[in-house]
Amino acid sequence: MNKLIILLIAFFLFNNCSFNENSRIWKDKDKELLGEPNIKKVFVKKKSVVREFNQNLNLDLSGIKTNFKYMNNRNDFGSQSYKGELKKIGSYKFSKLDELNQINFKPLFIENDIVFFNKKGSIIRYDENQKILWEKNHYSKAEKKLQPKLDFIFYKDSILVSDSIAKYYSINANNGDLNWSKNNTYPFNSEIKKYKNKFFVIDYKNTLRCYKIKDGSECWNLPTEDSFTISNSKYSLVILDDMVVFNNSIGDITAVDIESGLIVWQLPTQSTSILNETYDFKTSKLVSDGSSIFFSNNKNEFYSIDIKTGTTNWISDINSNITPVITGNLIFTVSDEGYLYVIEKNKGNIIRVTDLFKNYKPKKRKNVYPIGFAIGNKNLYLTNSDGKLIVKDLQNASILKIEKVSSNIVSKPLIFKNNLYLVRSGSIIQYN
C-alpha cells in the first residue's frame, strides 16, 4: 500500500513539473531570459553637468611669453602677439568652397604673402595688398570636379601639398610651377609636418607616411588599426627630437622613430567598440610642451601623456575636440558646450570654468558650438558655428566683445604678424 502511494505521488510531480518545452517552470524562466535582451549601445557619451567655477579667481599672467611663430612641429603656439583692435583691413577672395561642414584647413603665410586654394584646387599666392601674384592648377578635369581640399607646408623655395583625393606634390613657391607629383592609395586626412629632408602625413586608412622632400619617394609607412567608418575629424601629429607622435580615428596615440619608422610606444585611449563609432568620435589636435602631449576628445576626456614613455600623467573630465593652448603652467581649452577651462598643466587640476555662451538664449545655445580659438597677448578669441567671434579677457571672467564676423561657417582665428585672419567659404578676412 505504501509503495502504491509513493508511485502515485511521484507520477503527480513529474506530470506537473515536466522537462518538456511546455513546462510552466521553464516557460517562466524563458520569459525572464527574454525580458533581458543582450543589447549594447555603441558610442554612449558620458553626460556631465558643467557649471561655472572659481569666477572670482584672477589669473596672474604677468609672466606670459608672447610667441611669434605661426607654425611649429609641436603645435604649441601659446600666446601670440595681437593687440586686438578687430578692424577689418583686407579680404583675400577666391571661388567658394562647396560642401563644407567645417573649415579645418588654413592658409600658408610666406613673409608678407598668403597662399591658399579655391574649389577646383587652384593654388593662389597673394601679396600683402591682396593682389594675386600667381595662380596655378595641377589637377585634371576629372580631379577638379572632386573639389580637392589642400594642406600646405613651406620648405625653402618649395611648397609641399597633400590633398583630400590622394595626391601629394611639390611646387615652386615663387611661380607655382610643379616640381614633382605623386599619388597615394588613399586620401590624406591630416596636416603636414616636415623634419630635415622628410615630411609626414596621415591618410584615411590610419597610416602614417614618410616621404622625401626632394622627389616625394616614400621612406617608410606605418599602418595602425583601421576603423569600419570614415572619421569626421582630421588627424594630428607632432614631431619631437627623433620621434613622430600621431593619433588616428580610433583614439590610438603612437610614437614612431623618425629614421626607422618603428613604433617606440603606443597608447590606446578607447575601447574596441570605437571601431564602429569613428564618425562620431572627435579629438583635438595633439599639442606638446616638449615633455608631455596634451589632447582631448568629445567623450569627456582630456589627456596628458608622457612623451618618452607614453604613460598617462592625468585625465580630466572635459568634453572638447578643440585644440588646447598652453601658456606657462596653464592650459586653456573650450568645451563643446561653450565653457572656458583653465587647467593646471602639471597635475590636471581645473582651477577655473567660465561660461562663454551665457549671452545666448537657451534655444539658440543648443544649436551653437565652438570652432576654435587663439590667444592674443592676454585675450582669448573664439569663433563659433553661428559666425560670431567672442573676445574674452583671460585674467578675469569678463567678456570684452561679441562680434558677427560671418553669416555662415568660419575657421578658427589665426594670428600672424600682429594681424588676425579668419577663413570663410570664399575669402580670408584680415583684421588688425
What are these regions (language model features)?
Residues G63-I64, I89-L108, I132-K156, L178-K196, ...:
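Extracytoplasmic beta-rich repeat domains
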Residues N2-L8:
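Sec-dependent signal peptide recognition
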Residues K40-L59, Y82-L100, N137:
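A short helix->beta-strand "capping" segment at the edge of beta-propeller domains
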Residues T333-I343, N349, V353-K392:
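Loop/turn-rich, solvent-exposed surfaces of beta-rich toroidal or solenoidal domains
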Residues D127-K131, N172-G176, K212-G216, I258-G261, ...:
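Short loop/turn segments that connect beta-strands within beta-propeller blades
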Residues E111, N118-K119, D127, K156, ...:
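Structural signature of WD-repeat beta-propellers
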Residues I124, Y169, R209, T254, ...:
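WD40 beta-propeller blade core
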Residues F11-K46:
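Bacterial Sec signal peptide processing site at the extreme N-terminus
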